[in-house]
Each structure stands twice: as C-alpha cells, then as structure tokens.
Amino acid sequence: MPDAYVESLGKMIAILVNYKPGSITLENITRLCQTMGLESFVDQVSANISRLSIASKIIVIDIDYEVTDGKVIDVKLVLASNFDKFDYFNGEANILHRSLTTYSDLHEFHHNLKFLTLLDACSSIDIESNVSQFDLFEYYSMLPQYMQSYLDDNGAQLTVQTNLNDRFGIYLLDHSEKKVAKLTFAATQDPNQRYYEYKYSSETKEWINQSAESYTTGITLVFELLGDPPTYLPKDSLPPEHPDEGFTSASASELQRRFAFKCQNPRVTLVNDFTVDVYPASTFQLLNDNICLCFDILRRQKWWHTVLYPISQLLLHQGQDSAVGDAPAPAAQPPLHRRRSSNKGCRRASAAESATLGDENMHQLTLTEIMNKSVIPEDDAMMDDRIELYVNENYVYLGTQEGCSFYNDPIERWEAFVESLRQMLT
C-alpha cells in the first residue's frame, strides 16, 4: 500500500512539474531536485555567486548562479566513473547551460535532468571498485558513431547529430538537414527487463553483444520517427516491443486509426491488394538486438512518404473535368462495350421511313459514314481509358506496364514511378 501511494504521489508531482515547471531561479531548481529525489546543496563561491551542486549515484552538476542579476552563468557536469567524455554538447554549446539561460522556465532543463537521472539510475557501475558492466553514459556517447557506420554500410544517406534543440538525443538528418528520426532512452514498464549492450561492428556489418554480463535493467533504447504527415506502417513490420497497445486487439479505435486507400479519380480503377492493415506508428522500443531494425523502419518511412502517401493523395484528386463533390468513381472493371446495331429490331428500314426522314430534312447517313462514325458514348470511352492501379504494402503496379517494389527497387525508381503516375493523372 505505501509503495502504491508513493508511486501515485510521484506521478502527481511529475504532472505538476511538467504543467508548470517554474521560472529559472536557484530556489526553483532546488525544489525541482527535491521532487526528483536528487541531493542538492548550495555553496557561496563569492559575494555575488552561489553554486548549486546536484548529486546522485554517478552525476554531479554544478550550477553557478549570479545572485545580483538573478541568472545562471556556468554549468558543469562531472561523472563519478572512469568515463570523462560524456557528450552533453551540441557542437560547442553546453546544452545544460543553454537550457538554463535561453528559456524562460525550467521545462528544457527538467527534460534534460530526467534523462541524466535515468542513465544514472540504470547504469550498471560499481563506484567503489570502479568496475562497469554497462555504463550508459559511455554507451550514449559512442552510439552516434555506431549508428553512423551502420547507416553508411546500409546506404542510408543520413547524418547523425546529437543533442539538437538543447535536448539530449541522437538525431538522424537527411540531405536537407531535416530531422527524420531520433534515438533516446526511456524507462521500461518492467523494471526487471534486461537491456544488453549492443555495439556495431564495421567488420561483420552487424550489431553484436560482446559479453553476456554487459547488461542493465529497467531501460530501453527508443527509436522515434519525426516529421509530418505521420508515417503508416504494416502491422507485421513492427518490432515486437512496439509500445502501441492498439495493435493487440481489433478494437473500434484501432479500426478508425488504420489507413484506407480511397479513389475519387474517375481515370483510375483502384485494386486494393493489401494483405495487412497499415497503422500510424512513430515510437519503437528497440530492446537488445532489435536495434538492427532501425534501417528497415527508416526504409518503411521512406516508402510511405515517397510512394504510398503521395499516391493516396493523387487518388483523391478528381481530375480537371470533375467537379468538387462528385461521387467517387466505382472501383470496378469497366464493362465490355459492343458496337450498337444501326438496325432497329434487326429489320430493314422501310421506304416510308426513308421518305419521312427526307421530308423532315434530316441527314441520311450512308453506310460508309455509319461504319466510320464512333458509336461508343463519350462516358464509355472514358471508362475504356481508365488506369488500373494495384496497390500493396510492398509494391505498386500500373496495369501490367510498370511498377515499383519496396524490396527490389532503389528509391530513385520509387520517385520516378510516382512522378510518371502524377503526369498521367494531372
């Protein structure tokens, strides 16, 4: 009962801190440390400068505060371990210092402090003997190098950068420096869940765990897809630790969330060839060797934003000759059309009927004119020109002429196919 009470109280405090983190003062920083269970004490460095020291099992943060002006002038982080190259910078910028000097409240500093305390709590280090089974501070600092080598070896044209926007995190950027994905750490629901140290080997091109003793518990690596619109992925392509509980049952909310291709373009016959449903997915728990799924997830993200999503938008476009609000075109095969007989009821026109046509000054067609004249209605002709488009979670085909595949084709082929389809429909 006491444990449940303490846990509930901790959640309430976290909600209040997130809602209103408070302005950046020495007193508010001290209170924040108290709510997080961190030790803190203040020393008077000089007449105008106070130093707040924040300490836990491994981390020690010294914050120098100018009392007269009421602002932070310096922040330093020291680790009580044998690793002294922990990355808390973005280039030359100290993100702990920036989170206390660039913003109007403690929100960013609180976010960074939670990250540090998580690594502190979950690192498997014996401080007295200075023996480390799994130092998460060292692993976080080495992971960007592992990830860059992994992406380069798989041909992903992405650049790895750390601690952007004054927040801890490992970011993946494309050629235009747009943030595509982010790696960070988070606590697991099961505090006994093991997380092993996996390093990337450029020789074997694999993620390997070099020691069965190199593990910790209660933490996991989290891979987050960034950007808009959201990415939809096939259910069977997600890692087992995907945190979205909506995938466990076919609930009503799940049915509403899955993506459905719709066709309103009268020039297209859509053949929905999906074998699984696709759902919005952005966050993935990459426990242990599942870190090797990063490239597959990134390729799925690229496939969605390059092929499937643009095609879904093209199908919603009704064409230049269709008014907004027209009913969507039926996704059915066009009917077969026969040349209509010029005879009525298979009988010959009588002389009287011929005379009547002449008397009414109506043009009498010759046999040659009848044979050369198109007798297929304009609407039917348009249906004969419909494009048959097959869409699947792994491929897209335009009739039997051309297509592109998630597994077999390069990204350039994806882009060329979508552009070809766009030109046909616009």
Swiss-Prot record:
Report the domain of life of the source organism.
Eukaryota
Give me the ranges of the annotated region Disordered.
324-356
Q: Which GO terms describe its biological process?
A: negative regulation of transcription by RNA polymerase II; positive regulation of transcription elongation by RNA polymerase II; positive regulation of transcription initiation by RNA polymerase II; RNA polymerase II preinitiation complex assembly
From the Swiss-Prot or TrEMBL record, what is one GO molecular function term?
Answer: transcription coregulator activity
Can you list the GO cellular component terms from the UniProt entry? Answer: core mediator complex; mediator complex
Q: Which family does it belong to?
A: Belongs to the Mediator complex subunit 1 family.
Subunit structure, as described in the record: Component of the Mediator complex.
- The name on file for this protein is Mediator of RNA polymerase II transcription subunit 1
Taxonomy of origin reads: Eukaryota, Fungi, Dikarya, Ascomycota, Saccharomycotina
Q: Which gene encodes it?
A: MED1
